């Protein structure tokens, strides 16, 4: 038995159930692929293609036994056979939410990179004969779904909030609708701040703190849901392998942090210590602009990403028996509480 309660596969096993990972080169997708392989899954990565590659038939296999297929989601082209033999499909495709400012053009790109990809995969999966369909489609979302909710404890049963991110996540989750209506089990991963030195928003924050540019945001009262990369990948694999899990899943650690505590931990871990504070009035102004559908400046982006209070808890994962290896943030940076 491996960590998180997930069984490990015998060494050398490569003929297990098929897992198709869309955006398999991303931070979470690449770690999920490695973890699933070690648990006995046969991995297939779906890559964005160059000219002419999307129509390539068949599946290519590299020296490690990993399979590769191609697609061109903007043109709604998926390589024939890409889903053949896939018992599960994970679609986490989407342009990075930060650090580029949310200009109108950027907002359109953020939406298109999520909605068109998820919708295409869902439609193709739904169109397959019942015997050839994957058992589960796991698609992306984020805790931005909830908007700014103060101290409210946010389980998967809570509704959406307001703002650009909330609307984007609502549409993102709905994009998997064709698969759900066809009877496939669908799961939507509402992911928090992923803490990793390898990439993602957590890496961007760490880089800022290392050069002394980290800051507490306003009063620092806002709750910020986070999760370590290992737990994030394991949580996705757990959701894939447990048929009783369906619908939204908060991919967050059990102990969300207030911003002031996140600031304290990152200052200690990354140094040099920072006493900087972004004035609350600036966050409030940026937040009002974002909810009103403003032009999407850097301030609006920070207000929704880090200024909003989202006390999200992983009720679905905990209720199903998933075990977190890093339930508290201090352990991620090797610090005491």
Task: Show the residue positions of the predicted features.
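A conserved pocket-lining segment of Rossmann-fold NAD(P)-dependent short-chain dehydrogenase/reductase
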Residues: 204-231
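Conserved beta-loop-beta element that borders a ligand/cofactor-binding pocket
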Residues: 141-142, 174-197
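N-terminal Rossmann NAD(P)H-binding glycine-rich loop of SDR-like oxidoreductase domains
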Residues: 18-38
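Conserved Rossmann-fold NAD(P)-dependent oxidoreductase catalytic core, especially the SDR/UDP-sugar
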Residues: 118-163
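NAD(P)H-binding glycine-rich loop region in Rossmannoid oxidoreductase-like domains
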Residues: 64-117
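Glycine/proline-rich active-site loop of Rossmann-fold NAD(P)-dependent oxidoreductases
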Residues: 182, 195-205, 230, 239-249
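Mid/C-terminal beta-alpha module of Rossmann-like enzyme folds, strongest
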Residues: 235, 242-297, 334-336
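C-terminal amphipathic/interface module of NAD(P)-dependent oxidoreductases
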Residues: 1-13, 303-337
């Amino acid at each position: 038995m491996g960590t998180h309660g997930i069984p490990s596969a015998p060494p050398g096993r490569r003929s297990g159930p098929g897992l198709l990972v869309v955006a398999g080169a991303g931070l979470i997708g690449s770690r999920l692929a490695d973890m699933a392989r070690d648990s006995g899954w046969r991995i297939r990565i779906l890559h964005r293609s160059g000219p002419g590659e999307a129509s390539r038939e068949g599946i290519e296999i590299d020296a490690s036994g990993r399979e590769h297929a191609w697609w061109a989601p903007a043109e709604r082209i998926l390589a024939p056979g890409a889903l053949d033999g896939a018992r599960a499909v994970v679609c986490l495709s989407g342009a990075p939410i930060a650090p580029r400012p949310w200009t109108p053009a950027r907002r359109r790109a953020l939406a298109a990179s999520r909605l068109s990809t998820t919708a295409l995969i869902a439609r193709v999966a739904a169109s397959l004969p019942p015997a050839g369909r994957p058992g589960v489609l796991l698609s992306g979302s984020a805790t931005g779904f909830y908007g700014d909710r103060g101290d409210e404890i946010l389980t998967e049963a809570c509704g959406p909030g307001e703002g650009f991110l909330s609307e984007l996540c609502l549409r993102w989750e709905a994009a998997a609708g064709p698969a759900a209506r066809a009877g496939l089990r669908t799961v939507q991963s509402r992911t928090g701040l992923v803490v990793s030195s390898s990439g993602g928003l957590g890496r961007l924050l760490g880089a800022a703190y290392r050069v002394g540019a980290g800051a507490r945001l306003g009063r620092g009262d806002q709750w910020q849901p986070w999760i370590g990369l290992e737990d994030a990948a394991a949580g996705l694999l757990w959701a894939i392998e447990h048929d009783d899990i369906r619908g939204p899943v908060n991919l967050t650690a059990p102990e969300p942090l207030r911003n002031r505590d996140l600031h304290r931990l990152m200052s200690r871990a990354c140094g040099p210590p920072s006493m900087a504070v972004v004035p609350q009035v600036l966050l409030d102004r940026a937040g009002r602009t974002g909810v009103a559908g403003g032009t999407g400046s850097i301030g609006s982006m920070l207000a929704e990403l880090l200024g909003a209070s989202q006390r999200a808890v992983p009720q679905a994962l905990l209720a199903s028996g998933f075990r977190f290896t890093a339930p508290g943030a201090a352990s991620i940076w090797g610090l005491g509480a």
